[in-house]
Structure formats: structure tokens, C-alpha cells
Amino acid sequence: MMLEPSIDSLQKRIKSKYSLVTLSARRARQLSETNQPLVEKSKSHKFVGMALEEIEAGKLYIEN
């Protein structure tokens, strides 16, 4: 079974695995409260999956 989006494609956007987990968890919590995804047609129906798709699409990022 292949996960979408892949960890490799996500790490092109967010270099640190730990930052990736933190960002996706925070966004998933926001999505659970508001249910307003930034991507139009999400493949996932779970909030963490939606958050990862937003990161891959470049809608979420970490400011340095």
C-alpha cells in the first residue's frame, strides 16, 4: 500500500520530519474544528491526510 502524499514529496517542502509532524498535527486539529480545507478536492477524508495534502500543495509552510 502506497501512502499519498509520499514522505519524499513532503520533505521537499518541509525538510525536518519533526516539523512536518508538528505542522500537520496542528493543521489537522484546526481542520477538525473548522472543516475548511485549503485544497479544493482532497483525496483523504481524514484531517491528517488533508493537512498533508495541503503541505504538498504548498498551501502550508513553516516560516523561518
Curated annotation (Swiss-Prot):
Keywords annotated in UniProt: DNA-directed RNA polymerase, Nucleotidyltransferase, Transcription, Transferase
Gene3D superfamilies per the UniProt record, alphabetical: 3.90.940.10
SUPFAM superfamilies, sorted: RPB6/omega subunit-like
Name of a matching Pfam family: RNA_pol_Rpb6
PANTHER family tied to this protein: DNA-DIRECTED RNA POLYMERASE SUBUNIT OMEGA
BP terms from Gene Ontology: DNA-templated transcription
Keyword Nucleotidyltransferase recorded: yes
One CC-aspect GO term: DNA-directed RNA polymerase complex
Assembly with partners or alone: The RNAP catalytic core consists of 2 alpha, 1 beta, 1 beta' and 1 omega subunit. When a sigma factor is associated with the core the holoenzyme is formed, which can initiate transcription.
Cross-referenced InterPro entries: DNA-dir_RNA_pol_omega, Pol_omega/Rpo6/RPB6, RPB6/omega-like_sf
Catalytic activity: RNA(n) + a ribonucleoside 5'-triphosphate = RNA(n+1) + diphosphate
Its job: Promotes RNA polymerase assembly. Latches the N- and C-terminal regions of the beta' subunit thereby facilitating its interaction with the beta and alpha subunits.
Encoding gene, per UniProt annotation: rpoZ
Name by which UniProt lists this protein: DNA-directed RNA polymerase subunit omega
Recorded family membership: Belongs to the RNA polymerase subunit omega family.
One Gene Ontology molecular-function label: DNA binding
